[in-house]
Regions:
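Nucleotide/phosphate-binding catalytic cleft detector across ATP-hydrolyzing
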Residues: 1-159, 167-287, 294-340
């Protein structure tokens, strides 16, 4: 970028769990959506991974906040500070001025006008001059490599931290969609609750997240792909003495069953509302899974068996939305589905 380039273009997947920023076709920021603030002054102390390291470990003068809940902004001021801090990471090197930003930001397809306004306002307060919004399933489809402008139906199931976005896309628009606030965070909360109830061990959100990554599963029989048991360390919730509990994937699959069933039902509900011609395309093309939730072991197989339509996991599910927003950034004049 030259010295006289005053406009910087960035694409952002503003997620409940992680925020990803793309600039010049490269992922330049991939950080947890967490910010640490000084309680006395409300000044930002840390953002992203550094703030996450402080999460659940702070004293009275520091508060760590996850500004997004269920895919939407829950704390406007904290979100603005977090966006500003993460955008600063893109501007490496010394500069006499901050460039004005052209931004494309992914938002849940079930967002209300108020929620969309909150994202736009946060972006503008964080120096966004030209702000476009794109619905996350549309961005995910573009990121996966689907021709969203074709006269053909494609279904995307994007399972993030805070929401699951299901959309049927054709001719550059969303034909039918279903957005539910059941997603990765709910799986983590289920594990926390299960460990407390079943094993009497208190686990933090971060430990529950690690359990999900190591032994999380949507199926009780993974065959050859079964992971090894995971050892959980934590205090006994009754005696407060330290405990060591081995956890296997089968018990986590049982514990996550109800939450996964909610996602199944949401997909079925979206299919019910799909016009027959597009339904035929979806049966032929299969359904695409993106977002961190797509990485839950056995989820694609469970959904395929239940719904009788093949489910494919996107090549890079964690970054599909960000990559799609990055492509949209290069086509703001062409893509009529971008919201200004």
């Amino acid at each position: 970028m030259g010295f006289f380039s005053f406009i910087q273009e960035i694409a952002m997947d503003l997620g409940t769990a992680n925020t990803i920023i793309i600039s010049d076709d490269k992922i330049v920021v991939d950080e947890p959506s967490v910010v640490a603030l000084d309680r006395r002054t409300d000044k930002m102390i840390a953002v992203g991974e550094k703030a996450k390291m402080m999460y659940e470990k702070t004293h009275d003068n520091i508060r760590t906040i996850r500004p997004l809940r269920d895919g939407v902004i829950a704390d406007f001021t904290a979100c603005e500070q977090m966006m500003r801090g993460l955008i600063k990471m893109v501007h490496t090197g010394s500069r006499l001025f901050s460039p004005s930003l052209r931004m494309v930001i992914g938002v849940p397809s079930g967002s209300t006008e108020v929620e969309l306004r909150a994202v736009r306002d946060s972006a503008e307060h964080a120096d966004g001059r030209d702000v476009y919004l794109i619905f996350e399933p549309m961005a995910a489809a573009i990121g996966i490599g689907i021709d969203v402008e074709a006269p053909e139906g494609n279904m995307i199931v994007d399972i993030g931290g805070g929401s699951t976005e299901i959309a049927v896309i054709s001719l550059g628009g969303i034909v039918s969609n279903n957005s539910i606030r059941t997603a990765g965070d709910d799986l983590t909360a289920e594990i926390q609750e299960y460990m407390s109830r079943q094993h009497h061990v208190k686990v933090s959100e971060r430990m529950a997240e690690r359990i999900k990554i190591h032994v999380g599963s949507a199926l009780t029989d993974l065959g050859e792909e079964a992971p090894e048991d995971f050892i959980v360390h934590g205090p006994n919730r009754i005696t407060a003495l330290p405990m060591e509990v081995p956890v296997c994937y089968q018990e986590i699959a049982h514990c996550l069953d109800k939450t996964v069933a909610k996602i199944e039902n949401a997909v079925l509900s979206a299919l019910e509302n799909t016009p027959p011609e597009l339904y035929a395309d979806i049966v032929k093309n299969g359904i695409w899974l993106s977002g961190g939730g797509a990485l839950l072991r056995g989820l694609d197989k469970r959904l395929t068996d239940k719904i009788n339509i093949p489910f494919h996991i996107a090549e890079d599910p964690l970054h599909s939305v960000a990559k799609g927003a990055g492509i949209a950034l290069k086509n703001v004049d062409r893509f009529s589905f971008l919201m200004r």
